[in-house]
Amino acid sequence: GVSSKFVPFKNNISSLDVGLADTDRLYELMTEKFSWDALARDDYFIDYQNLYTFLGVMSQRGLFTSMAHAFEKVGEMDRAVEMLDKCQEVMKNYPLETVCLGFSSNDYIVVEMVSMYYRLGQPEKARNLAVNLFNSLLESARFYLEFYEFAQDEFELCGQYIYFLQDEVRNGGDADLAKKIGNSFEALIDIATGGAAASDGSES
């Protein structure tokens, strides 16, 4: 709230939308005042408490993504891209997929980052992030499918995020990658069930 504007009417905010804000002050805080050097270090053990705090309770990806939204909203696209890039730099040691940790809202934020990269004219960055997230989701889905009797909810949640990611990649103009994402997941189901989910190469 340190850069929010005081206005005489309701300021509509959400988890990834800070509403009205002084973007110059916001940029100053994010680039000059605040530091994430400790979070970005790779010489300490990231235990569950760190994961729970920085991916869930005080989501750092959520922070950077909401800042990027604020800049995008007022047309400051370069600043928006800078926030997303900084997020990836700072959070490089933290997992992209967190269904197994119980706070999958992080996965939603990563998909939103992919979508934003496309909107901001950075398709290569969007593609790289999408592939990395998908690989993690597919690996988790494969594990949960093996123990489907006990992990049906987790498997289905992974599937929901895979299809959500596929939609955002397709909306970003990456039809080929979207098709690969859908077909790979359907092939996993096909192998497990002996069905023909992926035999015709159709997308979901």
Residues covered by each model-derived region:
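ER/secretory pathway lumenal C-terminal domains and tails of membrane proteins involved
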Residues: G1-S204
